């Protein structure tokens, strides 16, 4: 299949199949072995079993080859979900170990020659502009300016077929496979420097080298759009997916939810003028359609742009006398090219809008092509213009007119709104790319030794979580203001602290075995005197002994009550993700935090 694709694709370079048992392969002269090749191949494609690969890679590297595609498919998943080489019929831990050992042998064979390896378990890749199709795909991708990186062979085939039917072309189509060597970070870094690539699309399920990936994506995001379609891994839990969202935002990557959005976003970013906020002006010959579109815009977090009083008055005089003009701007079903032209001339000068979305519905007098030409003339303006000519055969020529001029056009208003909001999000991601943390204030001298000592004591005790008292001390060491907290080892000691404070207090039990104190009745607020504190602390010990009998009790935390009207209870902390390590989280705190789940993550 690979050789057929290479020849049928029109590749002009030499194709040298190696087969010791045949004189030719698909009509092309075959060679017995690597040593028999008349010239050194720049790219070698191995379709042999993986256990033969190390020796072949070493021979190719010694000869001067610098890239190898491992198209071997003798890989499966072991019981842990990790892909391994299948070296015998039954799949067991031994074969998983053999697979990892084989991977290391392949990488060690390539290392002395700086030879890079793609795969295994992938479809190969194609560069349509050079007629190179070194893939197992049965559909030849068209040439274009969009690069596609795909972790799934099935998704890659589907995307190529989907794009071909819509006349969408690619600069590169790359199946990444198991990424034993070349991974997403390497490929993004390469495509960043490719002048024929205007946008990078990715289907990814996970990434191995997080630092390389984020670094490459941030560099590419400054130059060209990087758009990712990543399914949510429900086995990993919602936190892991939220961390990926934070990574994508920090790297300037735009995340979409399906294949249609993947391409529509790429097309929009490649053809649309930039926006700087989420303010959109709607212009239509149908108030009902404009109203429905405004609902969609607001639901997606967009805003209707403010139109100045002077512009609204001029619109009323020029387009619809004696009719109140607001945003959405309704021109009426009799509007034609003259009304569209006057309205656009005024609206595109408004400083409070980021773009104008023109929605045209079929009317009793069909002037859709004339109106489309007027819109097309105004599209030379520096502001964004988007169009939606609703209908099928009657309006298709108008859509073709917009497409030929690279004006964003859509079949349904909702698609356009989603595209506009992704433009706004892309702009926001670009701003995040250049954000840097503020400098440390002058005169700030944290007590690092105290913080380290507290943490070391906890680690020595085999704990991975600080109690409230220790956390308060660490925060104080870094000059973070907190409500003063005092430690009490017994209920009687807690009562004595309350006597000294002479004001209502809050009481919390301290235990490394109790993460959520409220679930075991380990928190009491508004205790007015020492007796109430004594009774509450004693009751906490009794409840904990029943609910968590093996829990180690360190003592109690006593704090003055802080009551503020309409105050928010928040939480902030650090969690460790499976792939991206420590991440900061911030959100709603309190007893209902897990139920409400209003949390944001950031690197």
Task: Give the ranges of each region predicted by the language model.
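Catalytic-core regions of core metabolic enzymes
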Residues: 1-603
